[in-house]
């Protein structure tokens, strides 16, 4: 913990070690889902191949998720390195759908996003329809 005096204002900084994980299998995905449900929060952000969403070449590459400050995880989707990081048999569409059904469509989990309009377009493309509150 650090105290910083700037002019007449005193700021408190807490050094926080972050914990970030790449989800590699269904067991880890279930743990991520349990964390989101336990805290009641899921801050989600998609990364893509930067193609327009309605182009056939559009691909979501990663879904990053945080359930509390300092903790986060990436769900590998249609990324060129997905097979290097995930267990054999990883089906990113099924894993995305599972996360969507249990977290995004869960009324009791508050969704937090920076660009929800875009992220929700991706969700809808994969038949995930958010329920509850989104900030």
Set out the residue ranges of the language-model regions.
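Conserved RNase H-like, two-metal-ion catalytic cores of nucleic-acid enzymes
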Residues: 13-135
């Amino acid at each position: 913990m650090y105290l910083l005096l700037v002019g007449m204002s005193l700021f408190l900084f807490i050094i926080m070690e972050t914990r970030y994980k790449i989800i590699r299998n269904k067991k880890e995905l279930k743990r991520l889902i349990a964390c989101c449900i336990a805290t009641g929060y899921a801050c989600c952000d998609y990364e893509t191949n930067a193609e327009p969403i309605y182009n056939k070449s559009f691909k979501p590459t990663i879904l990053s998720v945080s359930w509390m400050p300092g903790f986060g995880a990436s769900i590998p989707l249609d990324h060129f390195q997905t097979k290097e990081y995930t267990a054999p048999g990883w089906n990113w569409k099924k894993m995305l759908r599972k996360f969507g059904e249990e977290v995004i469509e869960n009324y009791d989990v508050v969704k937090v996003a920076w660009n929800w309009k875009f992220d929700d377009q991706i969700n809808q493309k994969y038949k995930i329809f958010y329920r509850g509150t989104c900030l």
